């Protein structure tokens, strides 16, 4: 899996501007046990560099995309991170190795409950899982140094921009459901203005909930 991630990073360096990912991110990708986050029938494919179904019409993301999004977020040890779309909990686990605290929201109750139990069992004590609509963020713990959205939105949710700290970064796929979307890097400048940059074409499940 790690060799495949490295190869894809090289292949996409023209689009992403990244000939290599942060060594800390790659170390964590090699450490987090992906097999703990996939259903039993997907275990033979757990370490393939591909998305896998986890039930309820959702997927665990391709490891390369998890690594890229984590790298783009530039998470530091003291940071507080918000994730929208817990899914299996895999991305949250990766972020938990790099951040002080991870707050993650899942709208599909069975997935959220399973992820919470799984993360607790694996000892990720700095991750909190909430059931709810991630479009509105988690204002109680805002502002966040980084926000990762793991489902495609038709636009960048204004509540998430508000909850992003000045100097913070949001990584989010934007575009129509079930079509090719653009992975976007959203940066909130020190003066409160926002700049965006397209990183890479991607295909994510759609963000659900109220708009």
Swiss-Prot record:
It holds the Pfam family PCMT. It is found in: Cytoplasm. GO terms for biological process: methylation; protein modification process; protein repair. The keyword Hydrolase does not apply. It is an enzyme of class 2 (transferase). InterPro entries: PCMT, SAM-dependent_MTases_sf. The active site is at 61. It catalyses: [protein]-L-isoaspartate + S-adenosyl-L-methionine = [protein]-L-isoaspartate alpha-methyl ester + S-adenosyl-L-homocysteine. Keywords: Cytoplasm, Methyltransferase, S-adenosyl-L-methionine, Transferase. Its main location: cytoplasm. GO terms for molecular function: protein-L-isoaspartate (D-aspartate) O-methyltransferase activity. The keyword Transferase applies. One of its GO terms (cellular component) is cytoplasm. It comes from the Bacteria. Transmembrane segments: none annotated. Its EC number is 2.1.1.77. Belongs to the methyltransferase superfamily. L-isoaspartyl/D-aspartyl protein methyltransferase family. Catalyzes the methyl esterification of L-isoaspartyl residues in peptides and proteins that result from spontaneous decomposition of normal L-aspartyl and L-asparaginyl residues. It plays a role in the repair and/or degradation of damaged proteins. This is Protein-L-isoaspartate O-methyltransferase 2. It comes from Polaromonas sp. (strain JS666 / ATCC BAA-500). The gene is pcm2.
């Amino acid at each position: 899996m790690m060799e495949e991630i490295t190869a894809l990073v090289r292949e996409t360096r023209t689009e992403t501007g990244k000939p290599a990912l942060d060594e800390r991110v790659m170390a964590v990708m090699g450490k987090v046990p992906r097999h703990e986050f996939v259903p039993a029938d997907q275990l033979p494919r757990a370490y393939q560099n591909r998305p896998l179904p986890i039930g309820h019409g959702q997927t665990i993301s391709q490891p390369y995309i998890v690594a890229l999004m984590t790298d783009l977020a530039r998470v530091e040890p003291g940071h507080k991170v918000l994730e929208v779309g817990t899914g299996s909990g895999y991305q949250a686990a990766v972020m938990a190795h790099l951040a002080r605290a991870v707050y993650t929201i899942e709208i599909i109750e069975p997935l959220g409950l399973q992820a919470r139990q799984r993360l607790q069992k694996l000892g990720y004590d700095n991750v909190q899982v909430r059931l709810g609509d991630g479009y509105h963020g988690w204002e109680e713990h805002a502002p966040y140094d980084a926000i990762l959205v793991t489902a495609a939105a038709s636009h960048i949710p204004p509540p998430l921009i508000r909850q992003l700290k000045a100097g913070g970064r949001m990584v989010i796929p934007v575009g129509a459901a079930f079509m090719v979307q653009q992975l976007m890097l959203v940066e909130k400048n020190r003066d409160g203005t926002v700049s965006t940059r397209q990183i890479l074409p991607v295909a994510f499940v759609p963000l659900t909930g109220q708009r």
